[in-house]
Amino acid sequence: FDQDSDGNMNPVLDAFLEERENGRVKHIGFTGHCSHKAHLHMLAQLKSRGLELETCQMPMNLVDPHYDSFITNVLPELMERKYGILAMKTLVFGRLLGAGPENLRKSHGPTGNLLEEGFKLSDLLGYVLSLPISSLVSGCNTAAIVRENTTIVRDFKPMTAEQRDALLARTESHAGGKMEYYKKKV
């Protein structure tokens, strides 16, 4: 993030706030991919202006807590401020499965495959579903993936903290952000 961008963000935010006041916009949220620090900066800016938005969309997945974490650093603040939380990048565009678009594999290199390490798709999605989220955004590009995700959600049972911690312990070797190509140092 760039603090100089505040000058660009404030007029845009003000325009949306005005439209919300006029009834043309119902809810306003924010999102970002690169750094939890940008989210915390946005929340601080809003607080300094005495404002709150309704939602925040951010990357949340089973490797996130090991590196520059949105879950560890931003989620508690969002919960305290009663935001609707939208989890994205739950499978890191397929990279947790050793897949993803060819151009991404070329530009960011290969990654591990958590399925080959004994994880199930229900572990990966279930971990995020067990966090205090309002919605899980899953990129589905085939009907088969929609059906598979639907089955996982239908059969979902929330994980205990111990179950989540056990899964996290198994992904510790993926710390450092290699799988999470979108994270940038700021």
Stretch-by-stretch model annotation:
Residues 1-186:
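Beta/alpha (TIM)-barrel catalytic core signal, keyed to glycine-rich beta->alpha loops juxtaposed to Asp/Glu
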